[in-house]
Amino acid sequence: MGKKILKFSLDIIIIACLVAAGYFGLKIFERFQEDQQLNSSYESIRKDTKTGKHINWNKLKKINSDIVAWIYVKGTNIDYPVVQGKTNQSYLHTNFKKQYTYGGCIFLDSKDNKQFALNDNNVFYGHHMRNGSMFADLVKFREEKFARKHTIELYTPDKTYHLKAFSAYAKTADTSIPITFKNQEEKNAYITKLKNRNGVSSIIKNIPKKNEPIYTFATCSYEGHDYRTYVHAVEKISCSVCLLILEILCYYYIVFFI
């Protein structure tokens, strides 16, 4: 009798293990399929609306009027439309077609103005997907060589922003990231905090000047429980703008001094 009970118990345990393995295997397969579909949908929107640095904003707006920008980082998988929802939950697990997907979208904080120059701190969020998509490559900015050589490109209907990181680090999640500051002193104190957190020595020189907006990029990090990778950046003047300024200065020099 005892042997029968033992055999029955073992059979139950084996069946339970098989059911559990099947369930988790199915979930892993479903996540894999979902990730593949997510990558495919983003690849499709790139082909349909983006040629090099040219974005077809009319097409994008027809797909989703919540799209406010496009983010791109050379040498990474970061090449996505940026949306802004009514709340920060709107696109956490919703793609640009407004369909459920775990990977969601790259999104601008709902409290920010889509005109980036009007904000004290433009905050962007994205998932750190295990397959390397979305904001997974954001962690590369914590490497000296990568952070020094790479820029974050933000395309909007009105302007292209070239951003250089001035602080990059991983820490436990901030309960809230400031969007606005009461005054310059408060902003300076926040910038000092970011400088002290920074783990990449070569980029500290890029700190924002007075009245320059901060650009913050946040994603999950796997160093510890509830960790995040944060990258803070500032706009840099592009070479074309520098050349234009130089041409204007030369023109005035010729007119007034020669």
Segments and roles (model prediction):
Residues 7, 241-245:
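Intrinsically disordered, low-complexity serine/threonine-rich segments
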Residues 248-250, 254-255:
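Targeting/processing segments of secretory and organellar proteins
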Residues 239-242, 250:
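Cysteine-centered motifs
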Residues 21-238:
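Solvent-exposed, non-transmembrane regions of membrane-associated and secreted proteins
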Residues 1-4:
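N-terminal Lys/Arg-rich, disordered targeting/topogenic segments
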Residues 9-25:
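Hydrophobic membrane-insertion alpha-helices, especially the h-region
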